[in-house]
Amino acid sequence: KWYIPWSLRYWLFKCGGEATLNSYSSKEKFYEYIEYLKSLPHYIEYQDYKTKDNRYLVVSHSTVGKVWNIRNSTNENDVEEFNHFVKWSRWKNHDNEEIFNVYGHTIFQEALLNEYSCGIDLGCFYKNKERLPNPRLCALEFPSMKIYTQESLED
């Protein structure tokens, strides 16, 4: 029997996780990948890559929003709030003046590009064409801000 941490159950039952689980050859391989994913950073800063208005690039799973200013805090509550927000937040963009944030997690019909961020999740994995008629893979070329999309090659 699979042990699924509580934090992954929404993913399992609402976001296609069951199909993902079934694609693994063994439970051990699945748990190995979970440990690998848990070891990854919540965001990556590219301070040498800048926009025309001198914002440096930050790539994150979800938008960093208003919690960006607490990313280096040593306060346990701040750390927990930041990590949770960067993994799970939706619709809470914020202009953190020194950065340009590229993120996913929230599915859009088209890339959501503004002067301080770009949401690039166009739901490539999504199978329900009634709810999302045009799921695609999306990439942002930085700092030109050119957007590339590719339809899913899977059925």
How would you describe each model-predicted region?
Residues 2-135, 142-153:
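Acidic, His/Gly-enriched loop-helix segments that form or flank divalent-metal centers
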